[in-house]
Amino acid sequence: DSRYAMATVIFVNIWRSFPYYTISFLSAMQSIPADLNEAAAVDGAGMFTRFFKITLQQLKSVSLVIVFIHIIWTAINFDFIWVMTEGGPNYATETLPIMIYRYSMKTFDVGAASALSTMMFTAMFIMFLFYYRK
């Protein structure tokens, strides 16, 4: 059913990358100095205040990295989408890499595939510049 195809692909994408994100957040949380939480507790900060003012603030940079990595990984996904749906029923799960593959290998329209690849490279390059700017 084309209504559930993209939701299934999104679920599999999240499920497949969940361990990486979990380990990244775990290592970031373990690197937060315990002195910060102790000092805030001594100053009278509650559990929720410490979580929002200390823990989340310390995880902000890791969260940004994870979001950018996930966007980049999702943008270049081809393999598991092709294996699961080949672009889906009625093109429901067709992403840019699958469209490039269809143009280049199925219809042999190499010019359109090259133009789409150049656009995809430009978009990824801009994301990399934004990511490394910080």
Located regions from the model:
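Non-cytoplasmic
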Residues: 18-25, 62-87
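Signature of the 12-TM Major Facilitator Superfamily
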Residues: 7, 25, 52, 64, ...
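Generic structural signal for small/hydrophobic residues in well-ordered secondary structure
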Residues: 11, 19, 39, 44, ...
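Intracellular coupling helices
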Residues: 23-63
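A short glycine-centered flexible hinge/capping loop motif at secondary-structure junctions
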Residues: 43-45, 87, 110
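Membrane-interfacial helix termini and adjacent extracytoplasmic/periplasmic loops
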Residues: 1-14, 79-94, 102
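C-terminal transmembrane helix and the adjacent membrane-cytosol boundary/short C-terminal tail
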Residues: 26-34, 112-134
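Hydrophobic residues within alpha-helical transmembrane segments
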Residues: 11, 56, 64, 68, ...
